[in-house]
Amino acid sequence: MFWTRYAGASILLFFMLIRLGQLYPRNDMNNFGCEECKLKENNIFSKPGAPVYQCMGCCFSRAYPTPLRSKKTMLVPKNITSEATCCVAKEVKRVLVNDVKLVNHTDCHCSTCYYHKS
């Protein structure tokens, strides 16, 4: 008799948890608070009739334990390996705004993070 109640309560709890999970929106919580990689107007350098755009937004990054065979080949062994892609300009156009040479981004994509390279 006890096991029947226990099994029934477990099944009821399971279905309640499934229902609760369905109430939340199905968006990617990894990028919460960070928009996708796209062009946005730069308010500092833009002038009326001459907007200046730059790439802004998030791409992916992850970290994981370094495999032992990779660790053996490193000059300075590290326990954690990380990978990342950054929001960078795919195409650019050089412009002159108030005698300042600027690079106006015309297209964006997620690619290698150059500032991480050393």
UniProtKB/Swiss-Prot annotation:
Disulfide-linked positions: 34-58, 37-87, 55-108, 59-110, 86-113
Provenance organism: Cyprinus carpio
Secretion signal, residue range per the UniProt entry: 1-23
GO biological process: positive regulation of steroid biosynthetic process; thyroid hormone generation
The protein, known as: Glycoprotein hormones alpha chain 1
Reported function: Involved in gametogenesis and steroidogenesis.
Keywords from the named record: Disulfide bond, Glycoprotein, Hormone, Secreted, Signal
GO molecular function: follicle-stimulating hormone activity; protein heterodimerization activity
Family the entry assigns: Belongs to the glycoprotein hormones subunit alpha family.
Keyword rRNA-binding set for record: no
